[in-house]
Amino acid sequence: MTDSIQKIKFPELIFGFVAPIGADLTTTVAAFRSYFGRRGYRVIEIKVTDIYNVLQRYIVPDEPLAKSPLHRRYATYIAYGNQLRAKFDDAILAATAIRRVMSKRLKIGRTPEEHFSKTAFLIHQFKRKEEIDLLRAVYGRLFFQVSIYSRRGARVDYLSRKFASSDHATGHLRYRHAAEELIQVDEDEVGKLHGQRVAKIFHDADFIANLDAPENIGNQVDRFCELIFGSNSISPTRTEYGLFLAKAAALRTLDLSR
């Protein structure tokens, strides 16, 4: 039976990005695109919230989706995501992303091997554990969660400057309060059953890209992707080894035989 299952040498890979608001996602996504482009992979980028333009025709937003100013756009998009999760379930945005992967896949080639070979899907971004759980259930070991780290102060500064630029304002300091509020909502919407929970899923990542690290993002991404393809020339860093020991210790505390 197993002899009839054809092995795919370069299978499709699915990357789901988790980034707190204010962390610059574009640099990390571009690094993944560059790596897989060099590997000869077809790279398809899917932005989760792009589906809002279609969904709002059938499910009218309680708050109309704003295009500008930027801080208002973020707030209305967050509210609509909460509304969709309340109407369906907390994994709804992951489900729509999976549907879009299926649609893209069918346009790639004529044979099953072409459908499932040498394609990297970069899907951004997710905010709930239920979304990640669904993606792992569907794609198994072909799915990788990528979290993007940037310290809070840097995110507030980055976001306030974006708000100022969007409003064509000369100073960004008066936008810092709006940036702080939005970052808090994004991390954990206390009191909102179907709100965003980035802080709850961030550390479950298969890879954390550190925007504040001295090593550039391209090198971090290349190292991770080489490990995916089984490179045996890369040793764990001291930090990675420490994380492994901490994880192993945590698992031992859950051992029912103890």
Regions found by a protein language model. Give the residues of each.
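Small-molecule kinase domains that catalyze NTP-dependent phosphoryl transfer to phosphate-bearing small molecules
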Residues: 131, 149-151, 161-223, 250
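Glycine-rich phosphate-binding P-loop
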Residues: 16-34
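ATP-dependent NMP and nucleoside kinases share a basic, alpha-helical "lid"
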Residues: 122-164
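Short glycine-/polar-rich loops that comprise or flank the Walker A/P-loop
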Residues: 12, 41-43, 139-144, 204-206
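Extreme N-terminal, non-catalytic leader segments
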Residues: 1-16, 37-42
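Short, basic/aromatic recognition patches
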Residues: 234-258
